[in-house]
Amino acid sequence: MTENKLSPKTKKVYQYLSHLFNNGQLLAGEQIPSEIEIAETLAVSRPTVAKAVNIFVREGKAYRKSGIGTFLRNPAADKKKKKTIGLVFPLIGLSEIFRPITEGIAKLSETLNFSLIWGGQFNRANITGTQTEQMIDFYIEQNVDGILFAPVELTRNCFSINKKIISKIEKCNIPIVLVDGEYHEFPLRSKYDLVGIDNFRAGYVSALHFIEQGAKRVDFLCQPFMAQTVPQRIKGYQQALLDSGITPHKTWVHDIRNFSSKELLPLIQNGAQNIICANDNTAMKFIKALSDADIKIPKDVRLSGFDDIEAARYFPVPLTTVAQPCKDLAEVIIHTMLTRIENPYLPARNLMLDFELKIRESSKIPG
């Protein structure tokens, strides 16, 4: 921490706390004086004390116990102590990539000396702010050292829920690593580390696969309230069209609420033949609707997806898809968190791993 950046009064409190920390006036694990006591001792306001204490906590020199107070850390003991990491993947049951990532993180727990705890998953239709608060309260009670957070999606109030989760974690100065995507809408960027794939490039490569086969039009199919990875995929897909001399039209991006043949047939009738789906689950719904309408893949319509879910290769027509490196993601995610715990003031990092476009029958344009 650069003390010169602090106001004189905040600096005074910070130096007082540092004196307690460095000179052994309080032992590790002992509670520091209350904000009222420090304010009276140093003749400063409580908000000034709170600001200095927050800095001290963020630097890892102290920790809070909810409803009790703030306590000094023992740096040497903390380095040996097994870290506890909380997992917030609320919709793990709806996205297959999170399960292998979670399994990969769990496998690393012994060699990297950390414990992983999970507060459960939510029902998509019934996610509430109360549920998320209860889950975060559980992690706070467990005194976790960090939280891995994959933002909520596919529900109308997902942005407010995500902000509620982040706000509650922030108040306790618990390190956060975002998994897969940002919780802000583009172009906003949060102050937290983010680990995922380069979704812009993945969208670009998916579109290029169709363009290189001679396609002059490529459409993109998504659903409402999807993760912030999807807008990045759309931007990449549109850039590939532009770079190939094709002007992308807004009408080529389809936000589908009802995957019925009745709703999807006009899309095909209006010229959509080569279609990128926002993920494999979206593709699976689309394939069923096409089958109900007796539209053949890849003869009449070609499509691709993202995530390479287990079923993708076993679809009636195997699905071309962007495979995410879940094992590598797990390793980078946990190393990022452990680094963040030890170095809370590092700048926020965007860690983007490579992916593989697995080309199967669903995207092959007939010769």
Residue ranges of predicted features:
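A short alpha-helical element within helix-turn-helix/winged-helix DNA-binding domains
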Residues: 29-42, 267, 357
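Alpha-helical recognition/docking segments in bacterial nutrient-uptake
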Residues: 2-5, 15-22, 27, 37, ...
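Conserved hydrophobic residue
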Residues: 26-27, 31-32, 62, 346
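Alpha-helical residues within the helix-turn-helix
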Residues: 40, 57-58
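Flexible loop/turn connectors
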Residues: 16, 190-192, 248-249, 262-367
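Hinge/beta->alpha junction and helix N-cap segments in small-molecule ligand-binding domains
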Residues: 90-100, 119-130, 153-157, 181, ...
